[in-house]
């Protein structure tokens, strides 16, 4: 990526465009995630309809079905819903691991100046929702406080699906910011899950898991993509991490971290991390996450005490954290960063745009539901968490739609400018003259 340090005397610009190669890569990612977001929404809606239909018992029976009762020796006698959360989401987190490594080695996060904005925004978007949740639940104390991390996550696929529905054409700099913010957000979520939501910890299986992870890393570092060897090694690593008490999805991240980013040979078009990300992202976005959403979102509201749900501190804390906390954290930290560094917004961006993106980041679906399952296993509290995450995400989506749709005319004009290639060399003019 080219150096984007502004000339001396010129104010630094926030949300400026990336380089053209990075823009093309991000466009491919966003297309896949947008499609996956549509499937995610479909899975969640089907789950809600089924769980509240006369056939709700069959939904519960499907979710609780144990496909391998004989796996008790390895603690793998899991029901389908748990397989979706612990198994399929490991694919999602493997892609996250690839994303993180690519961003830190060859993407925006390798440059401290460009990394500062999404990192500061993500940290603010984690701390403020957590503080709001804790503040609301402090009096209740006890088990309620275990849910402090639920409203801290951002679901990029859900957010992109909302953008597709409202027909918004966010400027490239804002799209890059939203995606990088989500990547940093995922890193923080992984750290939180590994540290705060580990069960009965066993050191020996975790240490043994390092062996298949190391062998996996050795093969991919040598550019050996022998699936007959890599997939069994990944399964063994996942099994051992699961046995250790650390959430099994962490294995996916660790495996992703072992994959090299830079091209091994001069003739290679892409590094192996980008190649594997291209292969596995459709599986993650198009299958793993929608199936998890199908099993995680099926909360039954039939006969529920709606008054009790609405006044439950857990529910209030999650909804307030997602809707208010994310906006205050992301918008506020970005505003303070601009003030302290005397930076200016890119010419095509307004503070209203950032407000809309901050609201989009309040859509915390997949990882929020996962953390909710880890914090409150089943029961009334577990169902209330699902209802709260769904409610908060829908409110955030509606508010973001209201804010961003008002700027659609300007976004279409910017999108046309970003496509203009007057000399027909395959690179739009704005990416050749980014300082102009």
From Swiss-Prot:
Question: Any keyword Calcium?
Answer: no
Which segments cross the bilayer?
Answer: 35-55, 80-100, 116-136, 147-167, 176-196, 201-221, 226-246, 283-303, 313-333, 354-374, 385-405
The annotated topology with respect to the bilayer is: Multi-pass membrane protein
Offer a single GO CC term for the protein. Answer: plasma membrane
- Pfam families, A to Z: Na_H_antiport_1
Q: Which domain of life is it from?
A: Bacteria
Gene name of this polypeptide: nhaA2
Name a GO molecular-function annotation: sodium:proton antiporter activity
Reported function: Na(+)/H(+) antiporter that extrudes sodium in exchange for external protons.
NCBIfam families, from UniProt? NhaA (TIGR00773)
What does the UniProt entry say about where the protein is found? Cell membrane
Q: Which UniProt keywords apply?
A: Antiport, Cell membrane, Ion transport, Membrane, Sodium, Sodium transport, Transmembrane, Transmembrane helix, Transport
Q: What does the sequence similarity comment in the record state about its family?
A: Belongs to the NhaA Na(+)/H(+) (TC 2.A.33) antiporter family.
Q: What is its main location?
A: membrane
Q: What is this protein called?
A: Na(+)/H(+) antiporter NhaA 2
Q: Spell out the reaction equation it catalyses.
A: Na(+)(in) + 2 H(+)(out) = Na(+)(out) + 2 H(+)(in)
Entry-linked HAMAP family: NhaA (MF_01844)
GO biological process terms held by the UniProt record: regulation of pH
């Amino acid at each position: 990526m080219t150096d984007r340090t502004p000339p001396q005397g010129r104010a630094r610009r926030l949300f400026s465009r990336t380089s053209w190669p990075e823009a093309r890569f991000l466009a491919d990612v966003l297309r896949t995630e947008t499609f996956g977001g549509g499937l995610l929404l479909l899975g969640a809606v089907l789950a809600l309809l089924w769980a509240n239909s006369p056939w709700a018992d069959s939904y519960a029976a499907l979710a609780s079905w144990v496909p391998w009762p004989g796996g008790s020796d390895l603690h793998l006698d899991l029901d389908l819903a748990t397989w979706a959360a612990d198994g399929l989401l490991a694919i999602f987190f493997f892609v996250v691991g690839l994303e993180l490594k690519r961003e830190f080695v060859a993407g925006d996060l390798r440059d401290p100046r460009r990394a500062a904005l999404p990192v500061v925004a993500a940290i603010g978007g984690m701390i403020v929702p957590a503080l709001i949740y804790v503040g609301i639940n402090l009096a209740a104390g006890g088990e309620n406080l275990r849910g402090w991390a639920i409203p801290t996550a951002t679901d990029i696929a859900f957010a992109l699906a909302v953008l597709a529905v409202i027909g918004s054409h966010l400027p490239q700099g804002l799209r890059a910011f939203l995606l990088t913010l989500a990547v940093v957000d995922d890193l923080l979520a992984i750290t939180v899950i590994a540290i705060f939501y580990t069960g009965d910890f066993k050191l020996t299986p975790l240490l043994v898991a390092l062996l298949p992870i190391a062998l996996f890393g050795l093969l991919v570092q040598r550019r050996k993509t022998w699936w007959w060897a890599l997939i069994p090694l990944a399964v063994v690593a996942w099994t051992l991490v699961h046995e250790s008490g650390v959430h099994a999805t962490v294995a996916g991240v660790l495996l992703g971290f072992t994959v090299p980013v830079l091209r091994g040979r001069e003739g290679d078009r892409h590094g192996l991390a980008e190649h594997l990300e291209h292969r596995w992202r459709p599986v993650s976005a198009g299958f793993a996450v929608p199936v998890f959403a199908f099993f995680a979102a099926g909360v039954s509201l039939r006969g529920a005490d709606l008054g009790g749900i609405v006044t439950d501190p857990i529910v209030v804390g999650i909804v307030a954290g997602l809707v208010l906390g994310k906006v205050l954290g992301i918008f506020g930290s970005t505003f303070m960063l601009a003030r302290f560094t005397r930076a200016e917004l890119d010419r095509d961006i307004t503070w209203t745009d950032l407000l809309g993106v901050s609201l989009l980041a309040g859509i915390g679906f997949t990882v929020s539901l996962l953390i909710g399952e880890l914090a409150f296993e089943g029961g009334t509290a577990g169902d209330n968490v699902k209802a709260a995450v769904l409610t908060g995400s829908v409110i955030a989506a509606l508010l973001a739609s209201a804010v961003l749709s008002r700027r659609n005319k300007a976004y279409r004009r910017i999108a046309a400018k970003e496509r203009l290639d007057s000399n027909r060399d395959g690179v739009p003019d704005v990416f050749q003259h980014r300082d102009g």
